A protein has these predicted regions:
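Bacterial N-terminal signal peptides
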Residues: 25-34
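Eukaryotic all-alpha helical interaction scaffolds
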Residues: 76, 80-83, 100, 120, ...
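Conserved alpha-helical positions within TPR/SEL1-like repeat arrays
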Residues: 62-66, 91-102, 113, 127-142, ...
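Short coil/turn linkers that connect adjacent helices within long alpha-helical scaffolds
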Residues: 51-52, 82-85, 119-125, 159-165, ...
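Inward-facing hydrophobic residues that define packing positions of alpha-helical scaffold repeats
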Residues: 46-49, 61-62, 69, 73-81, ...
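Boundary at the C-terminal end of the N-terminal hydrophobic targeting segment
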Residues: 37-40
Length: 274
């Protein structure tokens, strides 16, 4: 599902394709320094908006939305109007939850996103709603609360299905597969990642395909299907190596080493790690 904020992907270093947190944070902080804005000033503006009423609340809301647009937190310049108060407030809370997340304030990010959720549901904007639910799922995962994360990611998946958004579906299925693998449910994980692989073959995104294949390799390995794990990781490495994604290729070699160790080929595994 396309989102006005970058769709955060479940963070597991070996698997995720859209974990943009570090890069976005660097860009974000660079812009802040140029504009001479401090995090404390932004937090203060948000707090004053929450406490304000009437026209003062609208004025502060417009300042927040303008800030979000200037910093790239929203893709369109929005105004806080009386007739769109629910949507405007949903957008502000959702935007600020992401702001807290990229500034490593995970508890604030989650609590703010949970405030945003009922507003997003009332707004009628399914793109905004999908973004909010996705973020909540990621925040729960980052806190190690995998059960709650799965609940929200399943909701995102249903919205992706409704929107017939194959790219979004693939990302969400990758996240769900990662979560189910982490909770000891490899068969369920496999049921998500295999269709995601076929979607990426159809879409032609070689980098995302390699990520899906790498995750599938880990799942097959967990299930004891060593040859299938090897086949997936070999294809993933080939894609990353040919496209000169050195960091990703190194991850694939690490995954391949795990497969080779399971096959008893310790010497070959050691070569992968050199």
């Amino acid at each position: 599902m396309p989102c006005f904020l970058p769709k955060i992907t479940i963070f597991v270093p070996d698997h995720t394709d859209r974990n943009m947190k570090k890069a976005i944070t660097l860009i974000f902080l660079t812009v802040l320094s140029v504009l001479n804005l401090s995090a404390a000033e932004i937090d203060s503006l948000f707090s004053r908006w929450e406490e304000a009423t009437g026209m003062h609340r609208i004025r502060l809301g417009n300042e927040l939305l303008s800030f979000g647009y200037d910093e790239g937190l929203v893709s369109e310049k929005k105004s806080y109007g009386r007739n769109q108060s629910i949507e405007s407030e949903a957008r502000i809370y959702d935007m600020m939850s992401y702001y807290f997340y990229i500034n490593d304030k995970l508890d604030d990010a989650l609590s703010t996103a949970l405030i945003a959720l009922p507003l997003c549901e009332k707004s009628g904007d399914e793109q905004l709603l999908g973004n909010c639910i996705n973020n909540i799922g990621v925040f729960y995962q980052r806190k190690g609360l995998f059960g709650q994360a799965i609940t929200y990611m399943e909701r995102v998946y249903n919205l992706d299905l409704k929107a017939k958004d194959k790219s979004g579906m693939s990302s969400t299925m990758n996240s769900l597969a990662t979560l189910y693998l982490a909770t000891g449910q490899p068969e369920t994980a496999l049921s998500y990642v295999l269709p995601a692989i076929e979607m990426e073959r159809e879409l032609g995104d070689r980098e995302r395909l390699a990520i899906r294949l790498g995750l599938a390799s880990d799942i097959w390995l967990e299930m004891g299907q060593i040859e299938k794990a090897r086949s997936c990781v070999d294809e993933a490495y080939k894609l990353d190596h040919e496209d000169k994604r050195e960091g990703n290729a190194a991850i694939r070699l690490s995954q391949k080493a795990s497969v080779l160790i399971a096959l008893g080929e310790d010497i070959e595994a050691e070569k992968c790690l050199i």
